Regions:
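Active-site beta->alpha loop and helix N-cap motifs at the rims of alpha/beta catalytic domains
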Residues: 1-114, 251
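Conserved active-site and cofactor/substrate-binding residues in soluble primary-metabolism enzymes
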Residues: 28, 32, 86, 90, ...
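Alpha-helical scaffold segments in soluble metabolic enzymes
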Residues: 36, 94, 122, 189, ...
């Protein structure tokens, strides 16, 4: 990543998020992964994944992230049970009391309660909450746009919904890009094109270069296995980077989809694809 242009001016690294197998790691493994990433990142800010079903564990993760020198922790609503917004708010509040590390609140509405407009208003009262990783259900009420437009002056919004031209126009300044794991230059180009206001080109680049990745991801989920990061890791292997399979229960896709993924990368003009 660093060798191909990623730096403190254009990126924040996420250590131990969903694509990083956080849900299958022990507490000790999560801390070790974050420690290694922080050491290797140098001046690049690091967010440590702190998603958990346990508030007590979140408190420990917050303290460890602060000790390690992480810039942020990523916090989502506890899953499995259908927790209320008040449950989630108290969960966040406990983390804020545990340490001074910054917090990115991740709206994982597909596994837990969705963060409402009212909840975002309440989050403005917690100083450590500096970012929202944002995706929403979609309706005529334009929930995604409503929150970004209303709160872009108070939070750094990370677009996790692939609505990059729209979100940037409304004030979002960060963008969740899986392609950067194997093609960091693509994310750098995205930022430059957005900042230039060339939204037509951004959308064309997304359709021509990013969509094939996400389309294959969706296909794999529909016909073979589910999870996160499985295609990221295969693509990393295909451009010569050390990687692995996802931990079970997500099944290993590498041999089954290797050739299809390779063709996708070549068709998208991804650099460094090997033999």
């Amino acid at each position: 990543l660093k060798e191909n242009g990623i730096n403190q001016e254009n990126a924040v690294l996420l250590a131990g998020g969903a694509a990083g197998d956080f849900s299958t790691m022990s507490f000790e493994e999560r801390i070790r992964v974050a420690s290694i990433v922080i050491d290797e990142a140098g001046s690049i800010p690091v967010a440590m994944g702190a998603q958990t079903t346990s508030t007590q564990e979140l408190i420990r993760l917050s303290k460890e992230a602060n000790r390690l020198g992480a810039s942020f922790i990523q916090v989502s609503c506890p899953f499995y049970f259908n927790h209320t917004e008040d449950d989630f708010f108290d969960h966040i509040l406990e983390a804020s009391r545990a340490s001074e590390v910054g917090m990115i609140i991740y709206n994982t509405f597909w596994t837990s309660a969705e963060v409402s407009f009212g909840m975002v208003e309440r989050l403005t009262k917690i100083p450590q909450v500096i970012g929202l990783k944002w995706a929403t259900t979609r309706s005529v009420a334009m929930e995604f746009e409503d929150v970004v437009h209303s709160f872009a002056g108070q939070f750094c919004f990370i677009d996790n919904d692939l609505l990059f031209p729209i979100s940037h126009m409304l004030g979002a300044r960060a963008f969740e890009v899986h392609l950067c794991n194997h093609w960091p230059e693509w994310g750098i180009k995205l930022l430059k094109t957005l900042e230039a206001g060339d939204y037509k080109q951004v959308e064309l680049d997304m359709v021509e270069e990013a969509k094939p990745f996400y389309k294959l991801w969706k296909k794999i989920e529909m016909e073979y296995t589910r999870g996160d990061g499985f295609l990221d890791k295969l693509c990393m292997e295909l451009v010569g980077l050390p990687s692995s399979r996802c931990r079970p229960p997500t099944r290993d896709i590498r041999e089954r989809y290797r050739q299809e993924a390779k063709k996708m990368l070549i068709a998208s003009e991804t650099p460094r694809v090997e033999g």
